[in-house]
């Protein structure tokens, strides 16, 4: 159960608690940090609970905050400056604050699989298979009889619309649909009309630099002993971002040059009208994408992915599965080659042993004749 008590062992001292989502924050990460920080206060947490963020706001998120009257969360660079930390909308250390391993994480509220997180102490972790972290937070509010005001309802609704692409993404569950409809009523907005307004704001990219476009919603994922990077943007007109593919590829390549452990970079352009994708793909592991979707990546690095719309449900698991298969095949092949080399070496040693033995015999024979000759 979500605790009403402070996790502090020193209850006389007010603590600073940071609540934040992942790097390159999207609307759900930002809204969830505000919603979760408010939940802590409503639950009676007497500490200084601060909603935070690890990066800049995108246009979609700015629109949602302004529409419902919220200020952006506090921008932070170090999580360990806080006494305690609450993570929302992520748990993967690679997607969190750079010093997350030095911070004291006390709670996690998420809707992703557990990915690389560990804690030496028992903590509260709630991650559920729904389309949005704010869907999980809505349930926590209801379970604890906390009233959801109009503006907080609007913020939760914005996150659900964003993460589920207006309830059309493969990640959408019936719980997301029911929650979104309830929140729309509380917020006093028409779900479809507001949803289209919000998503349209997120597709405006003409004044966004290539670097910011690539990293406004980008996540790193470990796959075996390698890493992949997947960025995603929404678009009503895929031609606009595709016309900028050269600049986008340059940003991606420069990033890979600096981060040698990234073996594949995918920049996904989601057509939110048809729910198809165009992906710009670079890196030595491009074959994983081709195998996953039975496609061939063009010389320009662009590939069409029919009915592929979700990074969480499709892109990451599909690509990871096939990359792991490639890694295993390479390991088997390497092992086979090593065994071949071992056999070659064994045969070489056997041959050398035979030659050495023959040489010994010849030497003994020669010495015998020399002895007889001198007698």
Put a short name on every predicted segment.
Residues 337-353, 357-361:
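Asp/Glu-rich intrinsically disordered low-complexity tracts
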């Amino acid at each position: 159960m979500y605790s009403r008590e402070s996790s502090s062992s020193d209850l006389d001292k007010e603590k600073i608690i940071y609540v934040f989502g992942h790097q390159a924050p999207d609307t759900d990460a930002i809204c969830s940090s505000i919603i979760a920080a408010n939940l802590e206060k409503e639950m009676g947490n007497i500490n200084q609970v601060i909603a935070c963020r690890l990066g800049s706001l995108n246009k979609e998120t700015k629109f949602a905050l302004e529409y419902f009257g919220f200020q952006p969360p506090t921008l932070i660079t170090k999580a360990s400056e806080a006494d305690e930390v609450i993570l929302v909308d992520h748990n993967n250390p690679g997607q969190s604050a750079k010093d997350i391993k030095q911070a004291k994480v006390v709670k996690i509220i998420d809707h992703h699989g557990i990915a690389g997180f560990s804690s030496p102490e028992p903590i509260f972790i709630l991650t559920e298979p729904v389309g949005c972290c704010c869907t999980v937070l809505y349930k926590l509010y209801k379970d604890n009889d906390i009233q959801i005001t109009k503006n907080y309802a609007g913020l939760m609704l914005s996150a659900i619309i964003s993460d589920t692409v207006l309830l059309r993404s493969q990640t959408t569950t019936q719980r997301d649909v029911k929650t979104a409809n309830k929140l729309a009523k509380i917020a006093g907005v028409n779900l479809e009309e507001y949803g289209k307004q919000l998503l349209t704001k997120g597709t405006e990219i003409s004044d966004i630099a290539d670097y910011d476009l690539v990293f406004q919603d980008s996540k790193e994922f470990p796959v075996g002993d390698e890493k992949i990077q997947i960025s995603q943007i929404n678009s009503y007109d895929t031609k606009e971002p595709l016309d900028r593919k050269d600049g986008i590829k340059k940003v991606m390549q420069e990033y890979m040059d600096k981060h040698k452990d990234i073996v594949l970079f995918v920049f996904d352009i989601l057509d939110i009208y048809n729910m198809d994708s165009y992906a710009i793909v670079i890196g030595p592991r491009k074959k994983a994408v081709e195998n996953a979707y039975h496609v061939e990546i063009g010389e320009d690095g662009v590939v069409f992915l029919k009915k592929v719309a979700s990074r969480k449900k499709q892109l990451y698991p599909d690509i990871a599965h096939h990359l792991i298969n490639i890694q295993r095949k390479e390991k088997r092949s390497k092992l086979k080659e090593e065994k071949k080399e071992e056999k070659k070496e064994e045969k070489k040693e056997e041959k050398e042993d035979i030659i050495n033995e023959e040489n010994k015999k010849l030497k003994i024979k020669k010495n015998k004749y020399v002895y007889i000759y001198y007698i």
